[in-house]
Amino acid sequence: LGRFSFCCEIAFSGEVWMIAAMKRMLLVLTTILTILSVLAEKTLDIYWVDVEGGAATLMVTPAGQSILIDTGNPGTRDAGRIHEVATQQAGLKKIDFLITTHFHGDHFGGAAPLSQLMPIGKVYDNGIPVRNPDRNRKDPAFILKVKPYKTMKVDGRVVVKPGATLPLEQTGGAAKVGLTFIAGARKFIDAPKGAKKNPHAGTVPSMKEDLSDNANSVASLVTLGGFRFLDCGDLTWNMEAKLVEPVNRVGTVDVYQVNHHGLATSNNPLLIKSVAPTVSVMNNGHTKGCTPSAFAALQDTKSIRAMYQVHRNLRTDGEKNNTANEYIANLTKPQECKAFTMKLSVTSDGKSYTVFNPRNKHRRTFKTRKH
């Protein structure tokens, strides 16, 4: 009996030891997973919210700060979509910085409704116009349209000056993040010292002067370490040329948000070939944007390895002017559209980035180029 008791004690002790060892192992695994989770969160995330041919590009820095460039159309639809992506996908409670590229309804219209759904910090724009910034200067309707934007509750307002930067927080374990304004109100950042003449200069003729507010668009260069992302709003042909001619003020980039939804009055081949992106992302609509000339300019740029679209072009020219379905977030007609959001994540060191299409779970990773 004593020997049996002794054996039972040994067995029991061994069982206790194994349970304790398993608990220690689980604790170690939990700690490792927590550390990996924290590291995984230190990405720069970019979301292209589907606002049906408008613009709304949401970014979350490694420090967790949020930057929203444009807010889509007036009404509750686009503001609701931005709010859903911000809160449910990005885990945000506030928009820290809102940048309005220009005063067309598909770019500033959703701001006031969004401010009713979540707090907005500082707003950056060219200054609210006192009259219609397009050709019809005496249009009284514009003053009524811009009033909600003018009176919405925000933490502060700043007029953009090319060369200025956003006061972004930095965080340990991640490369330096930054956003520099490179254009606004037809003014541009200074060219780098010692910059040589752009070899592409003079290769593309100019267009008739654009008198709309598109030409005033704020352009932003976003960086994380060596990674570079260019968002120029609806900047048009002649202004695009001034960014890179006679010298390239921008340099090369990794990702180019296709200007003006892919419309023909923008996407000057001179600009696209000069900034030489690896990836393009077009925030077009079902029938808006993705025009033959803009699509051709992207196709003819040798550096581009992948062309993404928020929508498939459903016009009759769509057979020729569309990227592969794999790279398109939304394929269907408006009444069937599920408003999938294209997402890009840059690693904390800025050395690579991954584009994710939630519609088909497509995922592709690219190495950041040397600039």
Per-segment meaning from a language model:
Residues 7-8:
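Cysteine-centered motifs
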Residues 26-37:
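Bacterial N-terminal signal peptides
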Residues 41-94, 213-237:
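Conserved beta-strand hairpin/beta-sheet module of binuclear metal-dependent hydrolase folds
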Residues 41-44, 108-236, 303-370:
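Flexible, acidic/histidine-containing loops and adjacent segments that form or flank the divalent-metal
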Residues 44, 62-68, 72-125, 131, ...:
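Active-site metal-binding motif and surrounding structural segment of the metallo-beta-lactamase
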Residues 50, 59, 70, 102, ...:
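Divalent metal-coordination and catalytic microenvironments
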Residues 55, 75-76, 103-109, 129-133, ...:
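Active-site environment of divalent metal-dependent phosphoester hydrolases
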Residues 124, 129, 244-334:
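Long, structured stretches of catalytic cores involved in phosphate-ester chemistry, encompassing
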